[in-house]
Amino acid sequence: MCIRDRNYFDNYIKNGNSILRPIHYPPITEDPKEAVRAAAHGDINLITLLMGAHGKGLQVQNTNGDWIDAIANKDELMINIGDMLSRHSNNLLKSTVHRVVILIKNY
């Protein structure tokens, strides 16, 4: 992405509020009985920070519609682009469609 004006986003965030919402998905230890952990979706916000996303289950959808495992190393931070950032960047940054699948090994 090439944004020439380094202050491009300033007017969008000036006097804005901020929300930090921590979410923890604990390991599944029992048979999920057809439960869906998180169906395919894009996040509505600017970005989603995924700390500790080094376990299996998170998948992102590529431009061909295929699902790819998204696994970070333990010392890495994964960042999902949200719908708002996609819109504000005129879709130069794409909102990440992702899901969380339940793996048989998890329980």
Give short role names for the model-derived ranges.
Residues 14-56:
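Short catalytic-site patches enriched in acidic/histidine residues
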Residues 8-9, 35, 50-107:
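Catalytic core of Fe(II)/2-oxoglutarate
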